[in-house]
């Protein structure tokens, strides 16, 4: 077993072996995020699904009200006048078959790939390089679209694509340590609602297995999912 660093061991002593109310958990995470940079805050959620079955797969998007605090590089594969539209909308990389060839050679300097439907037959050939990295465009994720400008705008503003991995776990960033705990909770609540709304039809038994939050360099804290689900804003 990998030995904990002195810093991680010290931070871990501040966390009790129990499930925390969400705002208390976020306060602890923020307090422990004392690295020399603005740490990313992440959620790791184990769901009661088996993604090897198509009716138990989860892949969708969510627009976080306070964004993620991170800038992302977006590549767009399209054709004709849409190439200039992608450029004007703020895409970091854009092109037609030239970009397809570049990606096929291993040039993957982007965080998100958007494609127009007419280019998907060519993009499909990139499955072996895009698939393992979770970058293959998908209509459900809003990354296969003719409305390139709006898609770029939304993803740049903090819209996230997320999915459950092979073990049924969702890993998603939802803010920065510099965010207030209230802003982090708003984002976390929005994420929870999206996961519930998009519950796979084949899910059986208990849907939410465990719910942890953590920072880039800190230990994780288990969150009371019921308290997140049942929260109602005052007024």
Curated annotation (Swiss-Prot):
It comes from Prochlorococcus marinus (strain MIT 9312). The keyword Protein transport does not apply. GO terms for biological process: regulation of translation; translation. This is Large ribosomal subunit protein uL1. One of its GO terms (cellular component) is large ribosomal subunit. Keywords: Repressor, Ribonucleoprotein, Ribosomal protein, RNA-binding, rRNA-binding, Translation regulation, tRNA-binding. The gene is rplA. Binds directly to 23S rRNA. The L1 stalk is quite mobile in the ribosome, and is involved in E site tRNA release. Part of the 50S ribosomal subunit. InterPro entries: Ribosom_uL1_bac-type, Ribosomal_uL1, Ribosomal_uL1-like, Ribosomal_uL1/biogenesis, Ribosomal_uL1_3-a/b-sand, Ribosomal_uL1_CS. Belongs to the universal ribosomal protein uL1 family. GO terms for molecular function: rRNA binding; structural constituent of ribosome; tRNA binding. Gene3D superfamilies: 3.30.190.20, 3.40.50.790. The keyword Secreted does not apply.
